[in-house]
């Protein structure tokens, strides 16, 4: 019985190893996106929240679908605030990442966003 418990304990400890060096904090990112959508705040304050979210997204180490999804959220916030230069810059970044990982769905979506 002791051997089984020790075996499960070892499997549990080995299975809990995380390879992420800089994990993105989703709650903080969601809070920034939520505050950037608050119409009761001034445009400058909302832009600061968006820029903070952008910094967190850029720190994510891997170019994956979650990073692209967050960049699309970022682009939408810039579009709502009529920051078209930052919108275009963010959408171009999405397109570059999508092309680098051969993600045809997000390439098409980024091209559509650039057409707006």
Question: Where do the PLM segments sit?
Answer:
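Sec-dependent N-terminal signal peptides
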Residues: 4-13
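A "functional boundary" signal
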Residues: 16-116
């Amino acid at each position: 019985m002791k051997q089984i418990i020790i075996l499960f304990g070892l499997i549990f400890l080995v299975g809990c190893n995380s390879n992420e060096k800089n994990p993105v904090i989703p709650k903080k990112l969601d809070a920034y996106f939520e505050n950037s959508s608050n119409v009761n705040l001034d445009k400058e304050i909302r832009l600061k929240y968006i820029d903070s979210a952008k910094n967190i997204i850029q720190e994510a180490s891997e170019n994956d679908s979650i990073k692209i999804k967050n960049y699309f959220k970022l682009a939408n916030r810039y579009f709502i605030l009529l920051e078209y230069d930052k919108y275009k810059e963010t959408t171009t970044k999405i397109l570059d990442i999508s092309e680098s990982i051969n993600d045809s769905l997000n390439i098409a979506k980024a091209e559509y966003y650039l057409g707006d």
